[in-house]
Amino acid sequence: MRTGIIAQKIGMTSVFNDKGERIPLTLVKVDDCQVVGHKTLEKHGYNALVIGIKDKKISRVTKPMKQVFANAKISPKTKLKEFRISEGNFIDIAANLEVDHFMAGQFVDITATTIGKGFAGSMKRHNFRGLEASHGVSISHRSHGSTGQRQDPGKVFKGKKMAGHMGCNQVTIQNLKIFAVDRERKLIMIRGSIPGHKNSYLSIKDAVKKNSITV
């Protein structure tokens, strides 16, 4: 198991294949992605690499993190993330990770944070049908309806689907296929859509369920 990388979502576009079929693509950019540190089985109980992306002003870094970057002899990074690895897949600290870490036709898993939607009702958040439009229903047309039973149990169970904050959740989309890799522009083109708004950070790693490469 090798390390993944951190990338930044640029936006979406599309191309047409020889059959005239439209293929939606998401563009992600890998810029200034470096190895910041190691986590070893002897010292930390597991093997992992700490990866950082995009240079950050030194004035915006805390003193403890300044020492971390100083030990690695690299400039401070905006985003850090750990990736679990197997024993023989360590990469030197301060090494650069480029877009050619992956190749066209490869399947990857992408972890990102969904776009926040704020406070949302049950119909938008959970796809409830709502109540009737007439026949005794007034004011509560978009309500979720009953939320419990009676005096016993006398409470609303945890996890009940109700209105509340929607979005801003970390999700992983599996088995997305890499359409192309542009080393000159530092871009990876991925088929389909991925979570998150433009310029948000996401992590890309080898697919757990699909490791074969198809062109």
UniProtKB/Swiss-Prot annotation:
Residues 136-161 are annotated as: Disordered. The modification N5-methylglutamine is found at Q151. It comes from the Bacteria. InterPro entries: Ribosomal_uL3 (IPR000597), Ribosomal_uL3_bac/org-type (IPR019927), Ribosomal_uL3_CS (IPR019926), Transl_B-barrel_sf (IPR009000). Methylated by PrmB. Gene3D superfamilies: 3.30.160.810, Translation factors. GO terms for biological process: translation. GO terms for cellular component: ribonucleoprotein complex; ribosome. Keywords: Methylation, Ribonucleoprotein, Ribosomal protein, RNA-binding, rRNA-binding. Pfam families: Ribosomal_L3. One of its GO terms (molecular function) is rRNA binding. Part of the 50S ribosomal subunit. Forms a cluster with proteins L14 and L19. This is Large ribosomal subunit protein uL3. It comes from Rickettsia akari (strain Hartford). The gene is rplC.
